[in-house]
């Protein structure tokens, strides 16, 4: 089957198209992302770099007769064939590629290629669950600013509790062993079941006991791993991964669906009921009460939707690192383009 033109597009192709435009036209840089959910996240970052000289177009990669998502499929294929470059970049979730530090093919490819940008955190779901921003999300959902639950303290406790097991998980990916402790094994080990603001402290205490038990099992299975375990632990700290922020580096879907959303729904339900009681108490008559309650109910948002659109991560260190990577890329490519133009003067200047 013949290839479509869109399957042959590379950075060089985009660069050639840019040169065909007028000198005053802005340079187009295509940014390929993994899924629909990633489009808003990367667009919110790339927008700050657009000016009179350049603009970004965020796209999903198309392959053959269908759309493939995930960097292990279309994006990794595009990278392997040399598609990325100054005019075409890939923006991906880090998954474990950042913490693996080149121990796998995927990790080495993503960390070594200057045209691939990653989230540092495991996925954008982790960034959307950035702890200092979660109270503001509750306010956006409920229009009630009362603080009923300390998300920052909870996620710090959760992170500290699972950190020893997280180190073992990363150790397993950096060190090929016969008994691999997989991400799935790790996630099963930190499952918290039904969680609510009322039982959060007890759930954390139980989690600590379960983690300690699993750590002892792993230590018995790998009695000679103490030195390499400590080396991985120190390496993670050098990468800026603190025990209290482990939640940013675990599987994003688990954090989002099993930890943050269930908690936030319960907190928001409490805030909504509180606001409804306030309206009922302050209403002068039944008609006013019905009108006010109807107006308020129609203004209450969705927890999942509000989290998906949460941009509070702009205050995070991970966001600052992404911005720094993009700044270096744009500075380097701008210098390269200027150098090329200086070495290829127009006919009128010769």
Describe the residue ranges of each PLM region.
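Acidic, divalent-metal-binding catalytic cores of TOPRIM
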Residues: 1-350
């Amino acid at each position: 089957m013949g290839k479509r033109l869109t399957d042959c597009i590379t950075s060089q192709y985009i660069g050639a198209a840019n040169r065909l435009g007028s000198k005053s036209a802005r340079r187009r840089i295509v940014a390929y992302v993994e899924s629909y959910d990633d489009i808003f996240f990367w667009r919110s970052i790339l927008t700050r770099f657009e000016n009179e000289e350049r603009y970004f177009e965020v796209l999903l990669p198309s392959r053959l007769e269908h759309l493939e998502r995930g960097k292990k499929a279309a994006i990794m294929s595009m990278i392997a064939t040399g598609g990325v470059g100054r005019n075409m970049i890939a923006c991906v979730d880090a998954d474990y590629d950042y913490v693996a530090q080149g121990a796998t093919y995927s990790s080495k490819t993503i960390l070594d290629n200057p045209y691939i940008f990653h989230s540092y955190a495991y996925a954008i779901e982790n960034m959307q669950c950035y702890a200092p921003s979660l109270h503001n999300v509750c306010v956006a959902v409920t229009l009630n600013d009362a603080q009923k639950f300390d998300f920052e303290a909870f996620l710090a406790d959760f992170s500290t509790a699972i950190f020893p097991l997280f180190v073992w998980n990363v150790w397993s990916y950096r060190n090929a062993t016969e008994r691999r402790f997989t991400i799935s094994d790790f996630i099963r080990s930190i499952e918290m079941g039904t969680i609510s603001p009322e039982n959060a402290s007890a759930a954390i205490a139980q989690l600590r006991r379960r983690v300690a038990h699993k750590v002892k099992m792993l230590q018995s299975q790998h009695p000679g791993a103490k030195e390499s375990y400590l080396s991985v632990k120190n390496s993670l700290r050098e990468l800026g991964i603190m025990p209290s922020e482990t939640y940013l580096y675990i599987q994003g879907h688990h954090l989002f669906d099993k930890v943050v959303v269930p908690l936030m729904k319960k907190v928001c339900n409490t805030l909504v009921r509180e606001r409804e009681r306030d309206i009922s108490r302050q209403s002068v008559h039944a008609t006013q009460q019905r009108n006010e309650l109807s107006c308020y109910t129609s203004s209450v948002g969705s927890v999942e939707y509000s989290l998906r659109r949460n941009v509070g991560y702009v205050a995070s260190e991970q966001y600052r690192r992404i911005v720094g990577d993009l700044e270096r890329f744009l500075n380097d490519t701008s210098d390269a383009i200027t150098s090329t133009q200086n070495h290829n003067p127009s006919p009128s200047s010769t």
